[in-house]
C-alpha cells in the first residue's frame, strides 16, 4: 500500500514537470502594436424598431406634436426603461433583506454505505442506510442588525425610484430641447432661404443696371458674392436641420434616420414674466428635485450600512433544530430516529479587527455621501439661478429681436427701392440685406432660446413632468 502511494505521488510530480504551463498567446493580440481580432464576429444588436403608432404619424405633410413625442419617448426610451428595471430589482432586494426575520428550513437526504472490520478482519460489519433529515435555523435576536439591513434596502429602493423619476425628467428635457432646437433649425433654414431669394433679386438688379450702363461690373461681383454667401448659409442650415432631427429621433429611442417632422416655430410667443422669485424657485427645487432626493436617500442607506456593521459585535440568539430518520436497507422495517433542538447564544470575541475596520470604512463613506449631497445641493442652487437668469434674459431678447427684425426689414426695403431708382449704391443694398439676414437669425434664436430656457428652468426646479391627458401617438 505504501509503495503504491509513493508511486502515485511520483507520477503526479512527473506530470507537473512535463505538462506545459498555461499559454496566453492565442488569447490576446500578437504584439502591443496590433489590435486583437475576435475569432468570431460578435453578435450585433438589432436597431430599435419604431412603434407602428409613431410610424403612422411620419408621413409627408404630417407633423408630430410635442405631447405625442413626450408620450412616445416615455414608453420607448431605453434609459427610462433601465431605471425602472433597476427600481424593480431594488424592490426585490428589499424583500430579500426581510427574509432574515424568517426561519431557514432545509431538507437533506443521504444514502450511504458503511464497512467496518475488527480484530484484523476476523469480524466485519457492512450496512446500507438511507437517512432523510430536516434542519431549522432561526435567528431570534440580533440587537439591530436585521433592522439596519432592512433600512438600508428600503433607502436603496427609495433611491432607485427617485433615480427613475430623475431619468424621466432628464428624458423630458432632452425631448423638449430636441423639439425646440428642431423648430429653431427649421426657422433658420426658412430665414436662410429668404436671404437667398433677396440676394438673387439684388444680383439680378445689378445685372440689369450693368446692361443699362448705369452700374459697373464691381456692383455685379459684389452682388454675386453676397448671393454665394447666402447659398452657403442655406446649405449649412439644411445640414443643421438634418442633424437636429436625428438627435430628436434618438431621444425617442428610435433610429436617427426616422424622418420626424414637427410644427414650425411660432412667429409670436406669449412671453409672460416669471411669477415667482428665484428664492421660491430654489426652495421648490430643494424639495422636488428627484436627483437631490436620491442623493439624500443614498446617504441614509450608507448610514444604515454602518449601523448594520456595528451590530456584528453584539450577541445573537439563534434557535437550531434537527430531525432525521435512518433506514437500514439490509434490515427491512428497521430504522433509527434522531431529534435535537437548542438555543445558542453567540457572542463575537475577536476577528482580527475586521468589524472595526469595516465600521470605520462605512462611517467614512457615510460622511462622504453627506458631503456629496451638500455638493449637489449647491449645484442645484446654481442651476436654478442660471436657468432663472437665462429666462429673464430670453424674455428681453424676444422683444428686442422683434424690434430689430422690423427695423431691418424696413431698411432693406428702402435700400432696395433706392438702388432700383438709381439713387442708392449696391453697397448700401448689400449691407441692408446682410443686416436683415442677421436680424432674422437673431429673432429665431431669441424665440427658440426662450422656449429652451423655460424647459430648463422647469427641469432644474424639479417640476418638469409628463404631459397630462395625452395618449401615445
Identify the function of each model-found stretch.
Residues 1-72, 238-284, 458-473:
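Terminal intrinsically disordered/low-complexity segments used for targeting and assembly
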Residues 16, 162, 166-284, 387-390, ...:
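Periplasmic alpha-helical coiled-coil/stalk elements that build and connect Gram-negative outer-membrane
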Residues 16-36, 71-141, 173, 245, ...:
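A small-residue-enriched
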Residues 81-82, 98-99, 140-168, 218, ...:
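Sec/SRP-type N-terminal targeting helices
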Residues 210-214, 419-423, 460:
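A short glycine-centered flexible hinge/capping loop motif at secondary-structure junctions
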Residues 418-421, 431-437, 444:
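C-terminal structured "cap/appendage" subdomains that terminate the fold
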Amino acid at each position: 500500500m505504501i509503495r503504491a502511494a509513493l508511486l502515485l505521488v511520483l507520477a503526479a510530480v512527473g506530470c507537473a514537470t512535463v505538462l506545459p504551463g498555461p499559454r496566453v498567446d492565442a488569447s490576446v493580440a500578437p504584439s502591443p502594436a496590433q489590435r486583437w481580432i475576435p475569432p468570431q464576429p460578435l453578435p450585433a444588436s438589432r436597431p430599435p424598431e419604431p412603434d407602428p403608432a409613431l410610424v403612422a404619424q411620419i408621413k409627408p405633410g404630417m407633423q408630430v406634436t410635442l405631447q405625442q413625442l413626450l408620450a412616445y419617448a416615455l414608453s420607448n426610451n431605453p434609459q427610462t426603461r433601465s431605471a425602472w428595471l433597476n427600481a424593480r430589482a431594488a424592490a426585490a432586494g428589499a424583500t430579500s433583506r426581510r427574509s432574515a426575520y424568517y426561519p431557514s428550513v432545509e431538507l437533506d437526504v443521504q444514502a450511504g454505505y458503511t464497512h467496518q472490520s475488527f480484530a484484523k478482519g476476523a469480524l466485519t460489519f457492512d450496512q446500507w442506510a438511507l437517512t432523510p433529515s430536516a434542519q431549522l435555523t432561526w435567528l431570534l435576536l440580533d440587537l439591530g442588525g436585521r433592522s439596519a439591513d432592512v433600512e438600508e434596502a428600503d433607502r436603496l429602493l427609495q433611491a432607485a425610484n427617485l433615480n427613475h423619476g430623475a431619468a424621466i425628467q432628464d428624458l423630458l428635457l432632452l425631448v423638449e430641447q430636441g423639439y425646440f432646437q428642431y423648430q429653431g433649425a427649421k426657422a433658420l433654414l426658412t430665414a436662410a432661404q429668404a436671404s437667398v431669394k433677396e440676394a438673387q433679386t439684388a444680383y439680378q438688379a445689378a445685372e440689369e443696371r450693368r446692361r443699362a450702363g448705369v452700374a459697373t461690373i464691381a456692383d455685379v461681383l459684389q452682388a454675386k458674392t453676397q448671393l454665394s454667401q447666402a447659398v452657403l448659409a442655406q446649405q449649412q442650415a439644411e445640414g443643421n436641420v438634418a442633424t437636429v432631427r436625428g438627435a430628436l429621433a434618438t431621444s425617442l429611442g428610435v433610429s436617427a434616420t426616422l424622418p420626424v417632422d414637427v410644427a414650425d416655430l411660432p412667429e409670436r410667443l406669449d412671453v409672460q414674466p416669471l411669477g415667482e422669485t428665484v428664492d421660491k424657485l430654489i426652495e421648490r427645487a430643494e424639495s422636488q428635485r428627484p436627483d437631490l432626493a436620491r442623493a439624500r436617500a443614498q446617504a441614509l442607506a450608507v448610514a444604515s450600512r454602518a449601523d448594520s456593521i456595528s451590530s456584528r459585535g453584539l450577541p445573537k440568539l439563534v434557535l437550531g433544530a434537527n430531525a432525521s430518520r435512518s433506514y437500514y436497507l439490509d434490515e427491512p422495517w428497521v430504522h433509527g430516529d434522531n431529534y435535537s433542538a437548542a438555543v445558542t447564544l453567540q457572542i463575537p470575541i475577536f476577528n482580527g479587527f475586521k468589524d472595526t475596520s469595516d465600521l470605520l470604512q462605512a462611517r467614512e463613506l457615510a460622511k462622504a455621501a453627506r458631503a456629496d449631497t451638500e455638493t449637489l445641493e449647491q449645484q442645484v442652487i446654481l442651476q436654478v439661478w442660471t436657468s432663472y437668469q437665462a429666462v429673464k434674459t430670453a424674455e428681453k431678447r424676444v422683444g428686442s429681436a422683434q424690434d430689430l427684425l422690423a427695423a431691418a426689414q424696413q431698411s432693406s426695403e428702402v435700400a432696395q427701392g433706392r438702388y432700383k431708382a438709381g439713387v442708392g449704391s449696391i453697397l448700401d443694398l448689400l449691407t441692408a440685406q446682410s443686416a436683415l439676414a442677421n436680424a432674422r437669425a437673431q429673432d429665431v434664436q431669441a424665440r427658440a432660446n426662450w422656449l429652451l430656457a423655460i424647459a430648463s428652468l422647469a427641469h432644474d426646479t424639479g417640476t418638469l413632468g409628463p404631459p397630462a391627458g395625452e395618449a401615445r401617438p
